């Protein structure tokens, strides 16, 4: 049988103390209604023993000692429990053994310690306290650093100057944002006045090469251009300064012609002339260039005419689907099989055109009908993407912008506004002398994975004289009413008013970007007809309005 001491110590370890009696009281049992002891009705109500019950007990040593509250969770012990327990314990210690009393005292102390430890945690070590203090300090410092002040918000909202002029000064300047690349440009650099309203569809010069800029405000900028595996070139000393050095220049060209043709050529070092001086020379002097000077001349002309341009030797694809389309149709009926190579192309000249506003491509030597002249390089994409882009104004113009050509048979177009070759400066004419054809070289192998199996080459449709400007036809949309003027099926006066007014607005928009290469000299030029009709119509409209106003004034004065 288990001794009373072992039972008492076991109950003390469990958090509650009981003394042994004839019937051992368990933690879960409660006193019955016939018992002489009262129930525990509250969390802090101690069990009491009545006087009647104390008389029936055989001996005080079998009376239960005051127990702790049987709470579901551990907690601090009330102070009056310690006092009552101390008094009861002293009362029974006189009649009981000293050994049992000391054991019960140790049990009470252990129970108090367990109850206190359940609610009051032990103190942390010194190292842990230091770590926690460091974490709190770091958190406070980071919160101060991450705090956004009004001045910082103003700095974030400040427009980022990405103007083509290259100036980083944004103080007291008016900006306009590009709708494509989201950069801020100076309004003065694009010939906008301070009072002019802001255009929502504004596109900067980098995104659209046709955007007009105010040259006086633009600082010269030099952009690196990728030339494939070849070295970087910059054209220099190619402009003929006077008639005295013309023979020397021709002699140098002849010397280069006698040398074996190689992929990598050596040119003179870049000069220190800025774009303004080069642009002035290009206006006044003639550029005589052979095929060996195509790339350096292209870089020089591009730096004086565009803000950013990449000269390429192989056409690029917009995506992989364009290349798949060409690979699946490279053997169509209109694809010309020839042993033509781009290195043996005809020589061309690039100089100012007759209107003194645009560059033009001229034949350096005479060409016969059917001769392949030069490859038209650029970025190849589907025509639908060009037509649906609102920045191209295709619905208003009814044709492509300069430096863009539609393929005559495939639903593709070649865009040389950002990448291309010298042929990008070719102009359109109502009397063209070249056409765009698709050539499949027989001997030339692809120069890379991105190299096309076919080439888009300009072919002469008639004999071309030396020095004659090379031009392609206007690629009018099939629904454009200008076809009725071209085919002479209708006159401008007989056209419906919607078509008439649309043609007037379309030709006005086209003439702001480029001119017809015929120079308005031909009587059959549809652009010349529409331009003259538009000017006459506006003049008559102003006269009629002025006459109507004058008539109204007379009638007003004649009233009684």
UniProtKB/Swiss-Prot annotation:
The keyword Zinc applies. Keywords: Chromatin regulator, Metal-binding, Zinc, Zinc-finger. Residues 47-59 have a biased composition (Polar residues). One of its GO terms (molecular function) is methylated histone binding. GO terms for cellular component: Rpd3L-Expanded complex; Set3 complex. PROSITE patterns: SET, ZF_PHD_1, ZF_PHD_2. Putative chromatin regulator. This is SET domain-containing protein 4.
